[in-house]
């Protein structure tokens, strides 16, 4: 399906909040990452050529750009656009500059280097970058001694980005909220929006329309001022 970005999601969200942006992006990101894992990665060996901007899984090769790197020694994240001494060609760092342009209000995307923690890590930053991208893309973590590079992958099969039906949406949504810290209302809204699924919303209810089936999600605010889902039912 044609890419729909998180940036024009109709629900209100704080453009300066990493948690809000992550919540919007996580649903679709997890879905497509899981599909890529099943269809492309599997048990294949992988290889990255950052100078050519290519990543290989087995015998399959795709275009890849460097988002940034995690350092286990310094416990920091460094965007590729800020790593001026890397020697990487412009085409390999273009995606990180695109993410910087797309998210001008998000401090973490405007700061070249910062400390890692539970929220600020390569996976979360990559999911937001993928969600804001105008293209259908996934990401991959490429470990090396002392850290890991996170790359954004282009040219993947379209089936990875196919629309999720009601069962797949619910299965993925429930799986995410079971073990991933996020705002459940923004997670649902961002997932449905990027999935191309019509939905209505207010502060405490989202109703999604999957053809003739309507699913209602009810939320409440928690003490840490994020939304938690209280009920999922069929209308």
Spans of features found by a protein language model:
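Short, solvent-exposed secondary-structure boundary motifs
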Residues: 32-36, 117-133, 185-198, 207-211
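Secondary-structure transition/turn motif
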Residues: 56-61, 82-83, 154-156, 209-214, ...
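Short amphipathic beta-strand/extended segments with alternating polar/hydrophobic composition
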Residues: 62-70, 152, 215-221
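Surface-exposed beta-loop interaction hotspot
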Residues: 84-182
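Alpha-helical oligomerization segments
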Residues: 164-235
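N-terminal leader/presequence regions that precede the main folded/catalytic core
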Residues: 1-95
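Generic surface-pattern signal
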Residues: 18, 24-27, 31, 41, ...
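Short, ordered beta-strand-loop transition motifs
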Residues: 43-51, 143-145, 200-204, 221-224
């Amino acid at each position: 399906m044609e890419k729909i970005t998180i940036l024009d999601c109709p629900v209100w969200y704080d453009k300066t909040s990493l948690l809000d942006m992550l919540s919007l992006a996580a649903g679709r990101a997890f879905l497509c990452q899981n599909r890529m894992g099943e269809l492309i990665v599997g048990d294949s060996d992988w290889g990255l050529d950052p100078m050519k901007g290519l990543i290989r899984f087995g015998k399959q090769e795709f275009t890849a750009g460097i988002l940034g790197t995690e350092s286990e020694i310094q416990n920091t994240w460094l965007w590729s656009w800020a790593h001026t001494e890397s020697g990487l060609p412009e085409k390999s760092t273009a995606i990180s500059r695109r993410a910087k342009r797309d998210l001008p209000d998000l401090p973490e995307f405007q700061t070249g280097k910062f400390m890692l923690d539970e929220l600020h890590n390569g996976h979360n930053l990559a999911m937001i970058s993928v969600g804001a991208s105008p293209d259908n893309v996934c990401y991959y973590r490429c470990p090396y001694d002392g850290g890991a590079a996170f790359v954004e992958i282009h040219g993947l099969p379209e089936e990875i980005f196919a629309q999720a039906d009601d069962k797949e949406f619910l299965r993925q949504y429930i799986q995410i909220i079971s073990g991933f810290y996020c705002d459940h209302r923004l997670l649902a809204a961002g997932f449905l929006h990027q999935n191309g699924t019509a939905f209505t919303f207010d502060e405490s209810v989202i109703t999604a329309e999957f053809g003739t089936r309507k699913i209602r999600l009810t939320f409440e605010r928690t003490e840490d001022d994020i939304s938690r889902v209280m009920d999922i039912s069929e209308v």
